[in-house]
């Protein structure tokens, strides 16, 4: 598919269109097209932003099909949104008690959200559920979501946690981290270690290579101490290696690069999927801050307020907080 022109996704007055799409493979596929076409991406739903949903996915009233992006790219112009706008889902039958039932997709979304926010306030409290209600995770109130999780879904969550392996063998992510931290890794022409299973004969990403790499496709909330609701799709301990393989394979194919380059790009961007995608596309971060280096990480480890203040000035407070969490993961 041809890359879109720079001004496809802009309004008549020249301002960029803003889009929101739930984290996942669709976002990975469409984000480079939207960004290259001049659009902006929202990490959470914002007033006035175009909410994109995949065909067949439950959609709120007014949401726009992801086919819109593809159609604009193919036609090389901005098309009317109304041609791709959903009128809203048909109402579901209520339960005998008069409540709207939870769907399997909503149950899965609740479980995933709790897994991704393992460091957030307790599930028995209210803060987590009010946050999820604000993000529009499901059609239900925060009270209904909390009740659904505590009464029906928590046993499934505990069972899933018990079946996770305590430790994973070293994979490509750890190998890239070792390369990233090496004092000799400043050159992009350094030899790839012989033991790294970079690609199989088909040129694809072997699943075994992702055994040490796990990723969360949903946005992970920043620590409550930050006092902000901004989110970022970062790599987390609760996700599966299959998702990591899909993401890395997608980047390798999208940007025609090798496995080590992709994993090092993820390291430099604190595991942020959207930031890594833009970095591989444009050679810089979308937010304008520099990428992290080994020297920056060494400075970050120092218990020195002056050093920390310099890092915040260089990377921004949010990026420093994400880097600290990423290095601990």
UniProtKB/Swiss-Prot annotation:
Compartments reported by the entry: Nucleus; Chromosome, Telomere
Myb-like domain ranges (all copies): 94-153
Family matches, as InterPro entries: Homeodomain-like_sf, Rap1_C, Rap1_C_sf, TE2IP/Rap1, TERF2IP_Myb
Region (Disordered): 179-206
BRCT domain location: 63-86
Pfam family, one: Myb_Rap1
Keyword annotations from UniProtKB, A to Z: Activator, Chromosome, Nucleus, Telomere, Transcription, Transcription regulation
Signal peptide residues on this chain, from the entry's feature table: none
SUPFAM superfamilies: Homeodomain-like
Function: Acts both as a regulator of telomere function and as a transcription regulator. Involved in the regulation of telomere length and protection as a component of the shelterin complex (telosome). Does not bind DNA directly: recruited to telomeric double-stranded 5'-TTAGGG-3' repeats via its interaction with terf2. Independently of its function in telomeres, also acts as a transcription regulator: recruited to extratelomeric 5'-TTAGGG-3' sites via its association with terf2 or other factors, and regulates gene expression.
Record PANTHER family: TELOMERE REPEAT-BINDING FACTOR 2-INTERACTING PROTEIN 1 (PTHR16466), TELOMERIC REPEAT-BINDING FACTOR 2-INTERACTING PROTEIN 1 (PTHR16466:SF6)
Protein name according to UniProt: Telomeric repeat-binding factor 2-interacting protein 1
Species per Swiss-Prot/TrEMBL record: Gallus gallus (Chicken)
Gene that specifies this protein: TERF2IP
């Amino acid at each position: 598919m041809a890359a879109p022109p720079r001004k496809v996704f802009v309004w008549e007055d020249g301002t960029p269109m803003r889009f929101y799409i739930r984290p996942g493979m669709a976002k990975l596929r469409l984000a480079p097209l939207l960004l290259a076409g001049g659009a902006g991406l929202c990490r959470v739903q914002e007033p006035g932003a175009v909410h994109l949903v995949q065909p067949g996915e439950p959609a709120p009233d007014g949401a726009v099909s992801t086919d819109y992006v593809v159609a604009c790219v193919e036609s090389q112009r901005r098309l009317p949104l109304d041609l791709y706008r959903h009128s809203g889902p048909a109402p579901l039958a209520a339960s005998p008690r008069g409540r709207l039932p939870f769907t399997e997709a909503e149950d899965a979304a609740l479980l995933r959200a709790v897994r991704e926010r393992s460091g957030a306030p307790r599930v028995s409290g209210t803060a987590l559920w009010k946050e999820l209600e604000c993000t529009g995770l499901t059609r239900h109130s925060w009270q209904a979501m909390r009740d659904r999780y505590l009464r029906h879904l928590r046993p499934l969550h505990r069972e899933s946690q018990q079946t996770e392996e305590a430790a994973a063998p070293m994979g490509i992510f750890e190998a890239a981290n070792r390369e990233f931290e090496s004092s000799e890794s400043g050159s992009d022409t350094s030899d790839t270690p012989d033991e790294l299973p970079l690609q199989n004969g088909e040129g694809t990403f072997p699943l075994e290579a992702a055994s040490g790499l796990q990723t969360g496709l949903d946005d992970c909330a920043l620590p409550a101490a930050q006092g902000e609701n901004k989110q970022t799709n970062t790599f987390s301990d609760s996700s599966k290696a299959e998702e990591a393989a899909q993401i890395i394979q997608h980047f390798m194919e999208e940007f025609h690069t090798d496995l080590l380059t992709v994993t090092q790009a993820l390291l430099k961007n604190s595991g942020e999927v959207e930031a890594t995608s833009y970095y591989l596309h444009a050679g810089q971060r979308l937010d304008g801050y520099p990428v992290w280096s080994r020297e920056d990480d060494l400075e970050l480890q120092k218990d020195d307020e002056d050093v920390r203040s310099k890092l915040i000035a260089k990377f921004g407070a949010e990026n420093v907080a994400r880097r600290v969490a990423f290095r601990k993961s």
